Structure formats: C-alpha cells, structure tokens
C-alpha cells in the first residue's frame, strides 16, 4: 500500500515514465499474432521499466486490446449479445471476499439505475506465483463484469457514467489518501470496444499473471502495451498503464493547474448527451483527486471524446502543436488551434501519447518532441509504433516504411477504413468542421483595438512614498529594475545567495519571497526558452470561457493579450471597458469590474482576513452581475488603508472561484504596486492572473529617467525594454518546469511554499503544502504594517524627504540583510587557514554557528541533543584523516575560475585522499598524470553536464567518480553560461569550442527527458568507466526525495542534494534568489523517502550548499548525508573575497578570471585548502564524541540527536514545526542500514561489449587489426562504449589508427550505440539504430545503413534510419547515416564530421565545431545557438531559410575549398553506405553543388577572420582572438 503523507514524504510528488508500444493490423483483422507481437514488444521494452527494493515487484505493466468477443463467449457460462451490444471490464475489488461481493452488488445497483443490465460476473484467472511480496500484498480481487442495454456510443456513455459513479460513490481514492474504501472499486476499462489487463507487474509477469493472455483464443486487431518506471516502489495496481483510452510515455507538468481549471469548468457543462441534463453532475469531479498525471489526462480525454468529439479532435485540444509562432502553418489549421485555445489550456509536458477507441489507434507527440516514437509499416498491413526501434523482429524485406512521430504531429490508423490517415488530412478535416476563423474574427477582441485609456504621472515624492509602502529598496531599483529598463534583459550576478530565507529574515519580506519556483529535474526536462523559443508562447486571452462540450462562436469571446505585462494605458483600457464600444464595427459586449484590494492597517491580521473575504465576495458578485474581467487593484492605498499583498489577493480569489466553480467565467487582472521582479510576475500568473499591470515599477522607471539615474534611452524604449525583460524572464521561469505556453502555466501554481502555515495555504493557496508550517495572516499583516510605517511617518512634513532602505540582498551592506559570508567571517576563515591556527578557525565557526542573534538558516534553528547517547572519548572517534575522505569540492568549471584556483583545489583534495570536482568545463589532459613532485592536478570527480564540454572517452576514463549534473543550486532548471570574454584560447581548447565565442549549456540534458533516460545515461557512463561511481546531482525542492528514489532505482551510486544557496559563476539574479529550497528540507526528505522505499542502503547520499563549519556537516550527517561538498568556503580559503563579479572576468584576486594579469594576483596554496578540510574534520570529530558516535556511519540519519527548541526564539520562525524534518520513518524494509552498505547491480556482466572485448583482445593488447561481425538488438544498449574504455585505458587519448577494430552488426542497435567510442574503432550497423548514436563520439567511426534485405524499391532517404539526439556532445570522429534521423541531430557537436540524409527539428543546435552534411530536408529551428562548426545543407527546393534560426548564423554559397571538401565527404558516405541520393548528387556534381547552402556562425566566422589576419600580419593569434572577443 502506498504510504500516506508522513514526515516530508508526500505521495503527491510521485512521478513515472516508461516505454510504450502499439501493434495494429491496419485492416482490422483480429488474430492471436497481434496479441503475441504486442507482448513481445513489451518484453523488449523491459529496460525502460523498473523494479525497486524487491526485484519481483514491478512498477507496472499492461496491455489494451479490443474486446475479445469469441474468447469471452467461451469463457463465461451465460449468453452474450452481439458484439458491440455489451460492455465488459475487469474490476479491481477489495481483497476480502465479503467486501468484494459487496462491491459487486453496489456496482450492479449503479448499473441498473443507469439503465444497464448486469449479464454476469466472471472470476479472472490469475497466477501470482511470480509476484514479489509487495505486489502480492497489495493485489486486489479481480472480477470481470458484463453489461448490456445499449450499443455503440450510447453504451460507451452509459458505461462511463456507471464507472464514474462507482468511483465517486464507492470510495476510489488516489495514492496515499486516507479513509475507508480506498480503491474499493477501480475499473482499468469498462467498454464495449476495449479491454485492459494491467497491474503492478514486471513486463515478463504480465502474461504469466493473467492466464487469459496465454489463451490462444484471445485475439485482437490491435494491442497497446506499456512498461512503467516509477520513482517509488510502493505498489499501486491502478497506476499501471494503459488507461481507458491512452498509454503515455512522458509527464504532464501542468496537471495541477489543468485539474483546477477542469474543476472550475464543470459548472459550465450543460449537456444531455449522458442522459438528462442533470446526469452530467454525476460525472464530477472529472479528475480523480490524487490520481496520476496520466490518469487525469485520460479522464478529461474521455469526457471530450464521449461528449461528442472524435478522439483525434479531443487529443489535439489537449496536446496542440506549436501553432503560435508557426508562420507557414495553414491559416485554417491555425484558426482551429487558436479557437480551441480559448476553450482549454494545453496539457503541457513531454508526451508520446498513444490512444485508441478500439477502432482508430494513434499517437501524438508533444510540441517539443521530447519522447522517442518510431513507426514501421509492413507489406501485409502490420503497423508497429514503439519507444524504440527493434521491439519486434520484423524481416527487413517486409518493412515498406520506417517513420518517426514528429513534434506536434499525429499518427493515426483507422482499422475501419483499413488505412493510415495522415497528419495533414486529420487536421484539415478538423479545421473544416466549423468556420473557426469567422468565429475568431467575431469573438476575439485584440487589446490594441480597444479605446485608449489614460496614463497618470506621479511626482517624485509620491513615488518614493509608494515605493516605501511596497518595500522597494535602492538595491532592487539599481541592480534589478534599471538594468532591465536599459538592456531589455534580466541582470546577471554570481556567487549564489547566503542570506536567510524569508521566514528567517529579521526584516519584513514580500510574500512572494516565501514561494520558491519549482523546476524540472530527471522526471521531465526543463525547456530551452532561448534557443527553442519557436515552440513557446506568452500570448493569452482573458474574459471568461463557455461550455466545453457545446462550443460555438461565443466560446472565443475574449480579449487577446500578446503577453502578460500590461502598460498603464493598457490597463486603463480594461478598466474603462464599455460593452457598447465597437471593435471591428461591432459592440464587444465585455464588462470589467475593479475591486479594491486594501485593508485597514490598524486592524492587523484580522482586518486582512476580513478584507480578503470582502474581496472574494465582491468577485463572486461581479461574476453574477455579468463582469467578464475582474481587476484586483491596490493603487488607492493611503495612510489608513494598506495594500493586500497582490499574490494573496490573486490566489485567494482564484481558489475561491475554483471552489465556487465560477473561475472560468472571468479573467483576473492585477493592478499591482508590489510586483517588480520577474519572480513576482511569474508567481502572479502561476496563481491565476491573466495579466499584471505593475504600475509602480513603471512609475519608478520614469522617475529614474527624470532624475538621470537611467541615461541614454527614452521613456518608451525603457518601458518596452522592461516589459521585454520581464516577459522573457517569465518565459524562462515557465521553461524551468518544462512548460511552453503561458496558458498552461496560468494557475498551475508550480511553487514551493517555504515557511507558510497550512491554514494560509489551505485557504488561499489550495493544493500547496508546507510540512514545516510557518507564518500566518497576522505575520503577513505585520510585514505589510512595517513597510507601511516607513511610508507614512508620524510627521507628514518628513515624508517628502524619506529615502529607501539600502536592501543588501545581493551585495553585503552594513545596514542591509544578514549574510553568512561577511567581511568578518571571510577574514577569520582566511587568517586561520593560511596560518594553520585551529584556535582562530574555531573563532570563525563560532561566528557562523552563533545563531542566538542571527538565525540565518534552517539548521540554525536546530541544536544537538547531547544526552541521548553517552559521550565517547575523542581518541576513540574515527580520525580526521578518514573523515576528510568524505569531503569533495563543489563543481566549479575551468573557465569560470582560473587554472591556478582550479588546480590548487585539485592538488589539496588529492593530497587528503578526498575528491575535487572539475565542473562542467572539461579538464586539460596534462593534468591526468602526476607532477614530478607527486602532486596530482587531476580532478577525481568528472562532471557530465548538459553541454558535455570536453567529455571524451579519455576524460571519462581518468576519474574515480562521474557526476551527472541535473541541476545547480543557484539556478536549477537553467543551463550554464560562460561569456565570450572569458573563453580564452586555452579554455576553448579544453571545451572543444571556439575562442572568444560565448558558451551556453542547454537547460536540459538532451539525452535525459525522463527517469528511464537518466537510467540510460547512468548505464552509458558506467560502461565508459566501470570502476567509477556515478553520481546524480539534484537540487532541493518539494518531491526531491521521490526523484532520489528513482535515481537509486536507475542504479546511480551517489545522489547529491544541493541547496538553493549554492554558488555560481553567472546566473540571472532572480534565479539565484527564488528557485530551489534549503538543503535541510531536501536532504531530510531524501533520507525519509529512500528508507520508506527500502533503497537507502544501496546509494550514497551527499549534500552541498553553503556548508561552512563542522556543525553544518554534523547536522547534515544526522539528517542523512554521508558525504559532503564544499565550494564557496574552499574558494574563499584560496583567496576569494566575495566581490561577486565572477561573470565579468574582473576578479581582483585571480580566482574567477582568465585574464593573465589578474591571475598573477592569485595567492592561494593547496596547504590552505588542506588546513580548512582538516579543521572541518576535527570539528566533526568533536561533535561525534559529544553525541556518542564513534564513526560517521553510526551518526548518519540519526535525526533523534537533533532538537528544535532554538526555533522558538525567532519572531517568525517560532511558528515553524521542524518535527517533519526530524521524522524517522517506519519502513517495511526494517533491516536496511541508514547509510550505503551495498553496491548497485549495473548489469555490466551481461553487456554485449563483454563479448566484443574478448573478440578484440589482440587489438587491445598489441594494436593488431581485428574485423568481425555479429548481431544486435534494441536490448543491446551502449554497444562499443566499454570496448572504447578498454582501448582508452591502453592507448590514452590518441587511440589507435582508424579501423583497427572494425565490427559489423546486423539488426536494430539499442540506445547510445557507439557512445564515446574513441579513435581506432569502426562500428557498422546493417539495419537501423535508436537514440543517441555517437553520443560523445571521441574519434571513432560509425556507419548506419539499411539492411541488404530491404525491399528493392525501398527509398532510404525517405525513411528513418536513426533516432533523436544523435552525435550529442561529440568531439571528434565520423558518422555516416543512410536515411533520415530525428530531432536535435548533432546537438552540441564540437568536432565530429557527419553525413545524413534528412534531420528533424532543432538540427545542429548549440553546435560549436565539426562539419555536418545534410543531403535532405531539415526540420524547424535549424542551427539554433550554433556558434561554431559548419553545416552544408542540400536544399534544391529553397526550404532552408524558412526553417533556419538565423539569430547566430548566416547562409553562404560554397567556395572552392568547401566544394572540394564536400565532394570528397559525400564520396566517403557513398562508399560506406551505398547512398543513392549521394550517388545522384555526385553523378551531376557540377549541376548539384549549387543547391548546397553553407550555414556559417557569425562569431565563428569573425574569429576565423581574426586568426587569418593575425597570421598574415605576424601578430599573436591568441591576443587577436581575445581582442575580437572583447569587441
């Protein structure tokens, strides 16, 4: 049974992902063969599922088939009516036979009430002998019901009502919900068309468990199968897929908001299609509370489909393609999407969504193309779609088409018509169903076409008074607002945050500060809002919705907002809306209502609560009175009336109207004085606002212009710049959570509350939780009152001269916010470690640890309970020399910091036997060998981040640990960045990039879009270095514990929990402050969740984030960590003085700079760093002795040794309840250790490479060439990588001569074929390949070509040969692919050469080197972020310019050198693959070469020109490059 919410564990945070496949006979011919093939496909996807602590209890597997009428007639002892005239479904019932019988009787009563007859029940034959104890203990009773009384869609609708009533009335509940009747009745399906068998099973167990699936009489014309990978191990049979209509590979990121909006829409649904008009109420709530994201998607899809739409129509409403910026889209299709956007927001997130109603079967891919889906069609009408190629052994001679599902595209098989229906036909037919464009023209009201409103200017002293009342500081205006107005972009900062979270601050804080942005990590990816802007949208509408099931021309009667930030005059348009005002010659008919959000400040929290009730009541009254837009305004605050915090007002009204089920009848707009940062705007939208007018920030910008604070720009441009920066910032916040459209983000409330009471959250931010509790309305009112007093002084004559407070959030200021690192602590730390004086070090730690006055961190609220165990003598405690081996330095890249600083840390850690982390910038190979004096500059931990800078086979081989950086504490959900002025030639060489050209790491790893993708990369890295531990770095947030459980199940050796306050070399300032959570919360949740899952003893837990003292380490140990990372502190020890200018390359002490002159100022030494870590270890020993522990392992997870009494001394923090942080869970796995005591099974002994290594032994030992052939299947993953590791170990980075090891494979290569393969290895596949071919290619050669047995008329250049994300992070080598490949080909390629015959969207993204030849079409957004290398595209039809992202590249014609190189390369491709298109081009070279277009990055071209000029003039090339880089 799934545990209920306990401690910090919350079942609502569970995630899953999976493998999915469908097998269908296009002509609708039922056969046993289809069922067998579907089950075989499922077995070949087993590696995409998972098991937990008990291997025989799987995460879930299932199959959906057509109702097997002939089989069922023989299986039951009662007569069945004609096919299609009865429905059936397997019911999951209580285990007790008495309760099961009662449930059956209740279902029968409901069915009869709905006009259906229960024909009978059947006991479903099962065999549970293969199940593990967890699955068996949670196993329900299985009964199959048969219903009659209608046919066709009428039967489907009645069954739907019966099932929904059974769920609502008989107590089906979601995971972890309390109360009797949990999962009393659950129907995987109840239909006359389809039947689902599923459960908490492994893929091999499905057929073994359900004996029906072994019966040869059971037939179908289609089968959809699914293998589940969950982040937990708690069995829940209903959570397995398929669901009633769908099977899903991916995750819906916006599901909370989608469910809230669906709940609000229910009141508008008026239909008699399910019986009488009153019957529709029986269906509500449509979404089962607590159900999985996929289950809720399926429930809404059912409603839309059974409510009258075709299944394809319903799917496209929920997962529309990216139409907003698609300029070449057919206008009718665009109108279809725009119209439906007014009915429903997208269900956004990675999705390969397979669907069926039993006749049509199809799939759709999300707009970003984030899940793999491959399709095969055979000559006898068999159609297969799966997450991978090779799930079925189809003879190549029978396969006539090989396709892929493309972003936003739909694939559909209609078995009634016996054909594949094209995406174009589906959408053209749907677009023609109604006059959508006409409805839009008559209904939508563009904002800029409304009558103009007035904009009032305020004098300076009134603006200052308002700024004080709303908590503005000088720092905010100068560091945040002014740069946004000047530059149109968020300002950048560095070094992370070391100030208290809002609930611990002694200062009044904005309510926004108590909400931290959530972000995607592992279970779904963040999106790239910069390079993939083409699939994003900030456009929205406001003005209310209509009945979802009865659309007409009135359904889109709304105002169109191009983005959510309204200028003052634009808000005035909405305020003064007159229904009789005409737009396009017609009265628009829309009304607005302004509601004042103020309260009498003298009445405190009680007055605030009363005012909120008044505001909510006024909103409800306004809706009843016909208002379609409500404007929540705090503009008229004065001496007596204080503003209600805008976030509280918006969220409070939003949730009140959701509960009233009137929310969708009105749009919410905020006229806000307190919103000025990007985070503020994002929070307001995230909690329900359609638009924001931050009037005071506009007035502040105008005031700064008037006073000359902002210069060189006029008023209009400054305001436009601010709006542009804010909009881009909101888009980035959305993209952190993997959301593409503002409509999906609105109301999704993707935030974590830190330090807010459950009472406030339940009432005003419903759905959010904060296990520790926190501030109440009284405290919020106290913060407002403190600001209000500053604005309205007792003497009115003083008010005009009042100045803003300094701030001090981002930079230390004497009168500002408290910083853990301040001049005094920096001095003490450096003095103690440079002089080796432990006594002075203790003075430093006392300053940091002394929380009696400054409770600056959550750990500051904790104290040690020294009486729990008797103390032990210090000499009996584990020595410092052993403890220090648990320490590592945080990941700091070479490039962000200087070589001197980087190597100082490495030398010190290697001397101690500890570990340094090289960060994401690669490492100079010269450091891999020891220095003559015995020192070692090699970093023990090599990081693998999203850009894969410098990640080669040689790099991966030279380490003890490999760390996958999923997120960074200072900026989770974002990529890294290294400005061009810091990319000196020596940095570029290590990163395999171009000197002087700025580098940006993509926000996602493009090979990790889900938990099973992470498992694949862990497997890749373990193959690349079998002796290295593989780490996964996560950032603390709600739910990180369940992600960590998934990481453990994915076989990582170490999971790192980073705090939100980690350091960075460069990040937007708002990210630094408002994303992620304290590590104390994430670490405690991780420990508790791993224990509950029985996974704690198989994985090491590490923590980092502003660790500064032995006390910090001891508290982290007691909360569950056994290893510890330090970054800022050792950097300070090495000389950093916290100037926070790392991103500018101006570090005055030579730490965070590449400037040779500044680097000369570096004074750090390894000995200083050694002293620091030994001092920390000694302090830890002292604490261990006091607490009665002899070793660190004894102390790990012993949270009972901590107490929370210190929290009572803080005016806000005394309301925190830290008991959940210290909770010690009871687990079903009681024998497990609280620390890692066993090893993960990586399954390397089963790898195909073990055979390849044996067969290649002569080459590995002596360099003698070997050549051989073998077969390969999709289950053979990461082939060639371990072989490459052995070659690299023997021969280093130079490898062997090309082709020394030459292997030919026949079949379908599994994921990551040829990953990191070094020079000397050639791999050929006759067949096809999956995703990630040539990932990190390090000099090897890969050829993929169709099988020689392919049909004679097979046109390779029209068919798929490889998957997505091919050549990701390749640094050298060659790849030749005869055919078309998927999305993101050559992403981050930095040196490899490749030829391919067509690519999907986002080709050559972030490419920094190498050359790519494309002998076919490209998808959209080609060359986005491409800063180096060259692409040659064969473009006879002139389509490339329309698909090109021209921000960083330009198109050129070939010169003579280009033509010669291209001819030779195509010839090599033809020789390797027998390419027909290549041969056609070569045979008419003089005529065809003019059709090639050269794609050239501008910065790369500029650097090449600088090099050429320098060489011509005989000047220093490096200086010339950097001169060009610096402008």
From Swiss-Prot:
GO biological process: ammonia assimilation cycle; glutamate biosynthetic process; L-glutamate biosynthetic process
Alphabetical list of SUPFAM superfamilies matching this protein: Alpha subunit of glutamate synthase, C-terminal domain, FMN-linked oxidoreductases, N-terminal nucleophile aminohydrolases (Ntn hydrolases)
Location of the Glutamine amidotransferase type-2 domain: 18-416
A Pfam family per the record: Glu_syn_central
Pathway: Amino-acid biosynthesis; L-glutamate biosynthesis via GLT pathway; L-glutamate from 2-oxoglutarate and L-glutamine (NADP(+) route): step 1/1
Top EC group: oxidoreductase
Record text on subunit structure and interactions: Interacts with unphosphorylated GarA.
CC terms in the record's Gene Ontology section: cytosol; plasma membrane
Active site: 18
Additional observations: Was identified as a high-confidence drug target.
Activity regulation description: Activity is stimulated by unphosphorylated GarA.
Enzyme Commission number, as recorded: 1.4.1.13
Family that this chain belongs to: Belongs to the glutamate synthase family.
Protein name: Glutamate synthase [NADPH] large chain
Chemical reaction(s) catalysed: 2 L-glutamate + NADP(+) = L-glutamine + 2-oxoglutarate + NADPH + H(+)
Residues holding FMN: 1083-1135
